[in-house]
Amino acid sequence: MVVVNKTNLLLLLLSLCLTLDLSSAQLRRNFYAGSCPNVEQIVRNAVQKKVQQTFTTIPATLRLYFHDCFVNGCDASVMIASTNNNKAEKDHEENLSLAGDGFDTVIKAKEALDAVPNCRNKVSCADILTMATRDVVNLAGGPQYDVELGRLDGLSSTAASVGGKLPHPTDDVNKLTSLFAKNGLSLNDMIALSGAHTLGFAHCTKVFNRIYTFNKTTKVDPTVNKDYVTELKASCPRNIDPRVAINMDPTTPRQFDNVYYKNLQQGKGLFTSDQVLFTDRRSKPTVDLWANNGQLFNQAFINSMIKLGRVGVKTGSNGNIRRDCGAFN
């Protein structure tokens, strides 16, 4: 049996903290100032063009970023395509609903960068996804903010690594807090990043349990607004095609704003994992605060996105810059 005294434990914790600090220490604004000075404008132009083609680009890119960062860090491992020898992250059951427009946004931005000689293969796919996510938030009416750059692309992507790392629609605050804490994110970060549900859509089958089969006592979740239940049942009848999706935010689905929190106050959170933010006493005060002050929410969202972008950063021999975002070099 190994005995760990307090001194050894303290040293272990300090070592862990130092490792985490070093992994994100290389991140900085204007990281590519010397190698590709116009990187952010090039990516922005590509993203803007993609958004003009389809609005789905916005929520798809935002969701792709979360799914990437929550599984072994922000390293573009979610971009990797499966091969005969490896089933990659993107083909895990929980990632199959990631819209293709998110992947295409990164691919198009990469192509735009590679068309500039001094930028070709100089910018990581992980950084491209980070910039693109910032840009889609802003293009949807959300805040503009500076992003830290300098990530390398991951060298591994397996479907087996995904399980248990992503939030589920039925999660309560305890489960959500635990998942976010594993990535160094606080309760406030969790509430702020959940605000991304002000954009996007979800498949009807994800809400069936709340409006048809809640529990043995009642078929409908009592925390759902009655008018919203009627609306959901009309949009999502029992026999609907499982590919059909509905807006996450029933009020302003194409606008990045704080209406998500106002919806929660009215019992109009689409998922259980949304509505519990209002019904749980630990998160309710923050929901109320941001529902009443959009600027405070925007600032909190920026801070939490920057923290999210530091999760699992790859450095040195743990990563590289991919020539193709969908395949290892």
Curated annotation (Swiss-Prot):
<dbReference type="GO" id="GO:0042744">
    <property type="term" value="P:hydrogen peroxide catabolic process"/>
</dbReference>
<keyword id="KW-0964">Secreted</keyword>
<keyword id="KW-0479">Metal-binding</keyword>
<feature type="binding site">
    <location>
        <position position="75"/>
    </location>
    <ligand>
        <name>Ca(2+) 1</name>
    </ligand>
</feature>
<dbReference type="InterPro" id="IPR000823">
    <property type="entry name" value="Peroxidase_pln"/>
</dbReference>
<feature type="binding site">
    <location>
        <position position="73"/>
    </location>
    <ligand>
        <name>Ca(2+) 1</name>
    </ligand>
</feature>
<keyword id="KW-1015">Disulfide bond</keyword>
<keyword id="KW-0325">Glycoprotein</keyword>
<dbReference type="InterPro" id="IPR010255">
    <property type="entry name" value="Haem_peroxidase_sf"/>
</dbReference>
<feature type="binding site">
    <location>
        <position position="198"/>
    </location>
    <ligand>
        <name>Ca(2+) 2</name>
    </ligand>
</feature>
<feature type="binding site">
    <location>
        <position position="249"/>
    </location>
    <ligand>
        <name>Ca(2+) 2</name>
    </ligand>
</feature>
<keyword id="KW-0376">Hydrogen peroxide</keyword>
<feature type="site" description="Transition state stabilizer">
    <location>
        <position position="63"/>
    </location>
</feature>
<feature type="disulfide bond">
    <location>
        <begin position="36"/>
        <end position="119"/>
    </location>
</feature>
<feature type="binding site" description="axial binding residue">
    <location>
        <position position="197"/>
    </location>
    <ligand>
        <name>heme b</name>
    </ligand>
</feature>
<feature type="binding site">
    <location>
        <position position="252"/>
    </location>
    <ligand>
        <name>Ca(2+) 2</name>
    </ligand>
</feature>
<dbReference type="Pfam" id="PF00141">
    <property type="entry name" value="peroxidase"/>
</dbReference>
<feature type="disulfide bond">
    <location>
        <begin position="204"/>
        <end position="236"/>
    </location>
</feature>
<feature type="signal peptide">
    <location>
        <begin position="1"/>
        <end position="25"/>
    </location>
</feature>
<dbReference type="GO" id="GO:0005576">
    <property type="term" value="C:extracellular region"/>
</dbReference>
<keyword id="KW-0106">Calcium</keyword>
<comment type="similarity">
    <text>Belongs to the peroxidase family. Classical plant (class III) peroxidase subfamily.</text>
</comment>
<keyword id="KW-0349">Heme</keyword>
<keyword id="KW-0732">Signal</keyword>
<feature type="disulfide bond">
    <location>
        <begin position="125"/>
        <end position="325"/>
    </location>
</feature>
<feature type="active site" description="Proton acceptor">
    <location>
        <position position="67"/>
    </location>
</feature>
<dbReference type="InterPro" id="IPR019793">
    <property type="entry name" value="Peroxidases_heam-ligand_BS"/>
</dbReference>
<feature type="binding site">
    <location>
        <position position="167"/>
    </location>
    <ligand>
        <name>substrate</name>
    </ligand>
</feature>
<feature type="binding site">
    <location>
        <position position="68"/>
    </location>
    <ligand>
        <name>Ca(2+) 1</name>
    </ligand>
</feature>
<comment type="function">
    <text>Exhibits a Ca(2+)-pectate binding affinity which could be interpreted in vivo as a specificity to interact with the pectic structure of the cell wall.</text>
</comment>
<keyword id="KW-0560">Oxidoreductase</keyword>
<dbReference type="GO" id="GO:0006979">
    <property type="term" value="P:response to oxidative stress"/>
</dbReference>
<dbReference type="GO" id="GO:0046872">
    <property type="term" value="F:metal ion binding"/>
</dbReference>
<feature type="disulfide bond">
    <location>
        <begin position="69"/>
        <end position="74"/>
    </location>
</feature>
<comment type="function">
    <text>Removal of H(2)O(2), oxidation of toxic reductants, biosynthesis and degradation of lignin, suberization, auxin catabolism, response to environmental stresses such as wounding, pathogen attack and oxidative stress. These functions might be dependent on each isozyme/isoform in each plant tissue.</text>
</comment>
<dbReference type="GO" id="GO:0005737">
    <property type="term" value="C:cytoplasm"/>
</dbReference>
<keyword id="KW-0090">Biological rhythms</keyword>
<dbReference type="InterPro" id="IPR033905">
    <property type="entry name" value="Secretory_peroxidase"/>
</dbReference>
<feature type="binding site">
    <location>
        <position position="77"/>
    </location>
    <ligand>
        <name>Ca(2+) 1</name>
    </ligand>
</feature>
<keyword id="KW-0408">Iron</keyword>
<feature type="glycosylation site" description="N-linked (GlcNAc...) asparagine">
    <location>
        <position position="215"/>
    </location>
</feature>
<dbReference type="InterPro" id="IPR002016">
    <property type="entry name" value="Haem_peroxidase"/>
</dbReference>
